[in-house]
Amino acid sequence: MTRVRFLERLIRRVGIMAGVVLLISTVCGCAAAADTRTVIRVWSWEPSMPAVIKDFEAENPDIRVELDIRSGYDNLNRFIQDGYGLPDVVQLEYFALGQYAVSGQLLDITDRVTGYAGQYTPGTWSSVQLNGTVYALPMDSGPMAFFYNEDVFQQAGIDASAIHTWNDYYEAAKKLKEIGVYITADAGDASFYNAMVWLAGGRPFHTSGDGKTVSVQLTTDAGVARFTEFWQRMIDEGLVDTRLTTWSDEWEQALGSGQIASLFAGAWMPSLLLADVPGGSGLWRVTTMPTADGSSTNAENGGSAMGVLRSTRKPDAAFRFVDYVCHNAEGIATRVAGGAFPADNATLNDDQFLARTTITDARGNDIPYFGGQRFNEVLADAARDVSVGWQYLPFEVYARNDFKSTVGTAYEWSTAALRYRIAQERTEQEGDDDRAERLPDPPGPQVTMMDGIDLWQRDLIEYGTNQGFTMADDA
């Protein structure tokens, strides 16, 4: 899955450092028999977490932190089911947080965070709550932005900064196609789809206040229809490369060669572009998201929070760590310096942060990847524009896995149709009768995205019912 590949990349980058931290913790535990510090276990994939832990322990000498680098909710679910080996503190992506809140796995921290609401962006603060109860603190955020290869756009005679509406984007895609380039690639990514529906004003999911009743309205939601119809048009006209899976080696190569000219992604993308497409340094720029009507609204794609598991026997120490990571200015600054995009308003309004024109690479070098652009100014505006009211499903992890086998079938049909058309055109051009005999089978009747959406909704309703939720038209 694309999310797993993304997390695996982060884990590979932090793995060696984290191993050192774990080793130090082990040595201290063996050598210092009189050590009376409270020990808390933290599960996190954040690359800068070892540095954050070091600073936290210096300021909180009564607490020792053991870091365990993990990704994938199957691990967490297995430990929850077994009832032992659980951490005290866990990092969760926003889309997964509701699942653990509804199932009673996260500690209610509402009383501990009085007055915190105005310190975070509306989108992230909304994402750590369920019906007014706060279950975690925002760690970072992923407001959507439009990243593009300016060199390629200029070759096609396009000013990407003037793309404000989806129609502008559509017209740009046609011009790029004329020079043999795709404006973007999408092989069926649930996180991208949900973010674009959110951007379009869609609110297809809702969970009742008691967490027992869930509404899935994908087939009737106006925002779902608005984006799906637009994206279907882009795919039907061959303007989106449906063959390349996000985060695949082939996708990165296409970004590097200019074959894929842009992408819609969260504000965490700059450091990943630098790491995965280093040859694009100086060529790429970022601007705000085009919207259906050109209005200034936005959505989140990605980002994570940190919460305390209700099973912990050390809630106070655990929350002190969460508070340091997500609320303390020094803890936030360390993570932002390591590449995280902030969720707090203080950092988003900081002059030094906004004036940044470089990204720090793995060797500590400052690289002007966006050609000297003050990219954080764009991303900070994007964060402020995020609309509130979006809810993820309390079984969102399952829903995203199921997306590929339902809505994903429309992408598979499009890819099969494209490959058949290319093979057919080559056969006609070359007049090769032998090649004609080896043509792939035609893809059959078209499978549209709305066909897949209908199937996805039926799957989600069936799954939710089997999980004990009351599935309703209006929760």
What is the meaning of each model-derived region?
Residues 94-144, 196, 283-288, 378:
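Hinge/lid segment of periplasmic solute-binding proteins
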Residues 2-99, 111-116, 293, 329, ...:
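Conserved N-terminal structural module of periplasmic/extracytoplasmic solute-binding proteins
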